[in-house]
Amino acid sequence: LRLGAYQILYLDRVPDSAAVNTSVELAKISGRGQASGLVNAVLRKIAQNKTALPPIPERDEAKYLSIRYSHPKWLVKRLLSILGREEAEAFLAANNDTPPLTVQVNPLKTNAESLIKELEGWGVKATPHPWVPGCLELTGAGDLTTLAPFREGKLLVQDPAARLVSLIAGVQPGQKVLDLCAAPGGKSFSAAFAMEDKGEIVSCDLHKNKLKRIQEGAARLDLTSITPSAGDGRVFRPEWAERFDTVLVDAPCSGLGIIRKKPDVRYKKADDLFTLPVIQTALLDNAAQYVAPGGVLVYSTCTILPEENEQVTDAFLTEHSDFCRD
């Protein structure tokens, strides 16, 4: 009943009749054939009156939002405590949308205006991103990897928020940059664009098998400033001590800020998140040792939980008086 009602009320591409028929068949398949008549009658009634249904009582706010937007109740309660009702509901609704495909222009090969025209020639509509410079939103791209602009390295598929990391870092040509949790390489590539591929970027990741993707991406984009390196970002490497002008720590996290990109993230258990701040703190503490005097340390995640963001950086600043928040 709940699956069918959801399809009828919230999914535009599923005809009401299909939602009813499928739900009836599911009732029969699940061994509840005696309930199929009830399922049929209730769902048909909902379909006939879906514009005049009374509002659902919200005696349990978190439970209501959990059902309405298909998120676990523990997460909804946490979001309500962080964001408040209005912003939390907007966040939950956005998580059920399909994110636009966003690419960053490779300024070493082309510019936004030229790339927009070239993509249009391939039947792809491209528009400048509304708030991230150097990025485009694409419509009708299909398999982007088959298009010449992709194969020729004129663009990088990247979420706009990831692009912000290199902008915030303010990297400059000729600098030395360490990307401590680099795979699959997007932030390293973005930094190389900003540095005009001049300088040194060490792209480190714990998983050696992921370095191949960084190498392949750098080759496609014709970037020569990037050197992949395998290693645990929590383990000190003396040869890197105070060596880098900028160190990027895009720490492993719960991923609760990218649910619409990775819908399965919403089904993580609350207990799974407890160890993450320990890992994040260890990465940040170790990364601090690699920053040259006067350098920049950037900490980023793709989550909205304070335990993984503000609380980690606040604790770090308490222990490292030689750093300050910019």
Give the positions of each predicted feature.
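S-adenosylmethionine
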Residues: 1-326
